[in-house]
Design a protein with these regions (language model features):
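Short, flexible helix-loop junctions that flank or precede catalytic/ligand sites
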Residues: 1-375
Length: 375
């Protein structure tokens, strides 16, 4: 089996991932959906043979010792790929992810223009949140590329794994991958300050130690970007608090009120053409939000966001309403993805009743721009 052929096909089809497992055909993932490449399952031993052909002399014994391995490969006319090799049911399995060098712009992704202001802020903490596969990495890469193309500085990323390769433009971009460029995530964080960064990207916050490091970077005059697994802005604050004991919550909220710059929440919805589009919720740390954080009134953040459209904030349901009214997505798709299905349904009914009020969400008058690079 010529793995190079399949990797080139993966690139041609703009697939994000490829799956190789014994007993099943090769699958590729495009726009979040799996497609088989043929009908014949891979025979026993085939995936192991392919995996070992991609490893160097040191990686083979490492895999046999640890039973899992991460590595990066480059294939002419196909590009760069991240390969995860593992054991399953006594056989070897592989997942190959494309590492893209072409980074879509904020405009191409139809992201809120306020993100350009957010990424250009000199200091503070910016969180991009959403579920796995919601396009967080793509949006972050787009934001970083905007800053890289606009101003000078040193951008340092700590990722597991690297998903987009950034070129040096106006800024210097150093990308460190856990397992390849550093042995451990926390080791890289501890040494980050010695590398004189202006912007630090933390691939994902999973514990209190990483959260404390992110806040510390922001406190010391850096712009810190990070991702979290949460569904919306107020849930993000609750998730952060849950990293810490209750006795520390007041101090954490004070630190967030002083250092948080914004929370961008994202989920993907299906457009009329079947492509996945980002629906975004934007929280900006305005004086009103800062005061709510200080007082611990997290439950009031959603209402404050919905009342602050002119400051660049927007809730998920407002974004979904706007996209549906512009014909970008179906109403049922908007309702499916809504935080409050009943609340959004009521908003649709009121808008269809012809109240005569100006619709503050209808700024998709010409529909969403064509997205060449999907999530």
């Amino acid at each position: 089996m010529d793995i190079g052929y399949f990797l080139k096909l993966m690139t041609e089809k703009n697939a994000s991932d490829m799956f190789l497992t014994t007993g099943a055909p090769v699958y590729i993932k495009i726009e979040g959906k799996l497609y088989p490449l043929g009908n014949t399952g891979l025979p026993p031993g085939m995936v192991k043979k392919i995996a070992y052909s991609l490893m160097d002399e040191g990686q083979v014994p490492q895999f046999e010792r640890e039973l899992e391995l991460n590595m990066a490969i480059a294939v002419p006319d196909a590009g760069r790929f991240r390969v995860n090799v593992f054991k399953q049911r006594g056989e070897v399995g592989m997942v190959i992810r494309a590492i893209r060098s072409r980074i879509p712009s904020i405009e191409e992704l139809n992201l809120p223009q306020v993100l350009k202001d957010v990424i250009m802020t000199p200091r503070g903490l910016v969180l991009v949140v959403g579920s796995t596969g919601s396009g967080k990495s793509t949006s972050l890469a787009s934001m970083i590329d905007h800053r890289n193309s606009t101003t000078t500085g040193h951008i340092l990323t700590i990722e597991d794994p690297i998903e987009y390769l950034h070129k040096h433009k106006m800024s210097i971009v150093n990308q460190r991958e856990v397992g390849l460029d550093t042995h451990a995530f926390h080791n890289a964080l501890k040494n980050a300050m010695r590398e004189a960064p202006d912007v630090i990207l933390i691939g994902e916050i999973l514990d209190a130690e990483t959260m404390e490091a992110a806040i510390a970077f922001a406190e010391t005059g850096h712009l810190c970007l990070a991702t979290l697994h949460s569904n919306n802005a107020d849930q993000t604050i609750e998730r952060i608090l849950n990293f810490f004991p209750e006795s520390a919550h007041r101090n954490v909220l004070m630190n967030l009120s002083l250092n948080l710059r914004g929370v961008i929440s994202q989920r993907l919805v299906k457009g009329h053409d079947g492509r996945r589009l980002p629906a975004t919720e934007v929280l900006i740390n305005t004086p009103m939000i800062r005061d709510l954080l200080r007082r611990g009134q997290v439950h009031e953040i959603k209402a404050a966001m919905e009342a602050s459209l002119e400051e660049g904030m927007e809730s998920f349901d407002q974004c979904l309403f706007r996209m549906a009214k512009a014909g970008v997505i179906e109403q049922e798709e908007a309702l499916r993805a809504a935080d409050s299905r009943d609340g959004l349904a009521l908003k649709f009914r009121l808008s269809e009743g012809g109240s005569g009020e100006h619709d503050p969400y209808a700024d998709f008058s010409n529909g969403a721009p064509s997205i060449t690079h999907g999530f």
